[in-house]
From Swiss-Prot:
The chain crosses the membrane at residues 21-43, 63-85. This is Photosystem I assembly protein Ycf4. It is a multi-pass membrane protein. GO terms for cellular component: chloroplast thylakoid membrane; photosystem I. Belongs to the Ycf4 family. Seems to be required for the assembly of the photosystem I complex. It is found in: Plastid, Chloroplast thylakoid membrane. One of its GO terms (biological process) is photosynthesis. Signal peptide: none annotated. It comes from the Eukaryota. The gene is ycf4.
Amino acid sequence: MNIKSEFFRVDFIIGARRLSNYFWATVVFLGSLGFFIVGVSSYLQKNIVFFLSASDILFTPQGIVMCFYGIAGLFLSFYLWFTIFLDIGSGYNEFDKKKGIISIFRWGYPGQNRRIKLSFPIKDVQAIKLEVKEVLPARRMIYIKIKGQQDIPLNRIAENITLREMEDKAADLARFLKVSIEGL
């Protein structure tokens, strides 16, 4: 959902709360939990869960390795769920012609830089830049060029948009800001 008017525009950015992240966090959690349970079952020499058999697995070295992989996977899945819970990377791009300010906001990790907000005068915008790298996976980025600053990305790196959609977004934003488009 984006908000647009003649003098004001807000583009919302989806962060870590994507369906693919939920899927992979769940898969990693269940897989690592299975590894850990089988490793502990091999140590206890009895099946903790009826559908995960550990009778053919010796605790040394297979059970130890399975416990290690299970613990490592659980840490990874907790990290993924933590980023989903905090919605890391989400935010908005706000363009206000009346105030003459562009504000770019993103949520980060807890701590000093949890809220990342950049503000620039609209008059400092030089162009909208497009970058396309057709490697696996294809990388299509929209940047805003600002005087004296490095190019600032306006979309997610993992955002899977077609070339046409990217061109349309960039052209719409360039018309709104009355600047040119570079790239391609």
